[in-house]
Regions:
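Metal-cofactor-binding active-site regions of metalloenzymes
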Residues: 1-199, 207-225, 231-248, 253-351
Length: 351
């Protein structure tokens, strides 16, 4: 009996961070093209620096530290354009991902103000345009606010998202680890403003923070989707609110295992069982395919192999991803003419 989704089924990746989505070989090339001083001159050591590894302790903080170098390397218009172009095109070639929503914080790509923010955003839009000319894809950008940022900086990010909404910016997000200065209620007005201008709303919650934050985010910010959200399975009230409001979860299995937010596949089995029982809609994503060394079909395959999601469940998750995408008219994208490359073939190409 088949346990894996057909590779011909088109997919939408809704939760993918630009800092974790570019192959190490391309990151190496971008860094050298800009003359960035790297922590090592050895490519293989560099690859280990920006990807998960058994040599590194698995933790939420450890995972976030990987983004130090990737965000620095991507901090110029030229770097951002190439990064976005490579991710969108690569996702289609490797996994038949026809809709990629790439999220990033533009203020973490402008070297603390040295680079003009609008030039960074324009470069990301050009990267999407190039990929869309070459492949039958419909990408979009989500701008991440940061819990550690002062409100004034996050407000600027929302205003930039509104200003660039006609050039492929489709939503806003709140990301980053817990911060003593961050209050969900402070962002209610900002999120309402973003919604008024047609932007999709998603929030990282139910991951590293407290279980009760999920319900608080749903109540105060009224998001369309929730990034990760696995801890909602432990809160019946949160699941009821999510179901009643039609909110969709962006589940990233390998990421949650790597950060130890979820202890193992057996806990995931229980989590998905709770979501199905409570009619909570969910999608499957990578969080960062190259950083985590996994593609979206790898995630689906693992859930099928462990008997957590049936092929029908996987097909439903894929359909939900397309339906819940912030990118307009994603159903207009034609299906792939050939099957995507296997993971082995891609790794050989990179090496």
């Amino acid at each position: 009996m088949a346990r894996q989704l057909s590779r011909k089924v088109p997919l939408a990746e809704l939760h993918c961070h630009l800092g974790g989505a570019v192959t190490p070989a391309i990151m190496w090339s971008i860094a050298h093209a800009q003359g960035i001083k790297l922590p090592t001159r050895d490519y293989w050591e560099f690859r280990d620096t920006i990807t998960v590894s058994d040599k590194r302790n698995r933790s939420f903080d450890g995972y976030l530290q990987l983004f130090h170098w990737t965000e620095l390397i991507q901090s110029s218009p030229i770097a951002v354009e190439r990064a976005v172009y490579e991710v969108v095109g690569g996702a289609y070639r490797k996994n038949n991902v026809t809709t990629t929503e790439l999220r990033f914080n533009p203020m973490k790509r402008n070297r603390g103000g040295e680079q003009d923010l609008d030039h960074i955003i324009a470069a990301a839009a050009r990267g999407m345009d190039r990929a869309s000319l070459e492949y039958p894809v419909k990408p979009g950008l989500i701008f991440c606010l940061d819990r550690a940022f002062p409100f004034e900086l996050n407000e600027i990010i929302v205003e930039k998202a509104i200003a660039w909404r006609d050039r492929g910016v489709v939503g806003v997000d709140i990301a980053g680890p817990e911060s003593a200065t961050f209050r969900v209620a402070d962002y209610r007005r900002l999120f309402r403003r973003a919604r008024q201008y047609g932007l999709g709303l998603t929030v990282h919650t139910g991951e590293s923070g407290p279980v009760d934050e999920v319900a608080r985010v749903v109540e105060l910010l009224e998001p369309d989707r929730i990034g990760h959200g696995v801890k909602a399975a432990y809160d019946p009230r949160a699941m009821a609110m999510i179901r009643e409001r039609g909110i969709v979860l962006e589940i990233c299995p390998s990421s949650n295992l790597n950060t130890r937010v979820v202890s193992g596949w057996e806990e995931f089995r229980w989590i998905f069982d709770q979501f199905r029982r409570n009619e909570v809609r969910f999608t499957i994503n990578t969080d960062g395919p190259e950083m985590l060394k996994t593609y979206i079909r790898d995630e689906m395959a693992s859930l099928g192999r462990y008997g957590i999601l049936s092929v029908e469940d996987q097909e439903q998750a894929a359909a939900t991803s397309l339906a819940a995408s912030f990118v307009p008219n994603v159903s207009d994208v034609p299906a792939a003419r050939m099957e995507p490359a296997t993971r082995v073939a891609v790794e050989r190409e990179e090496a």
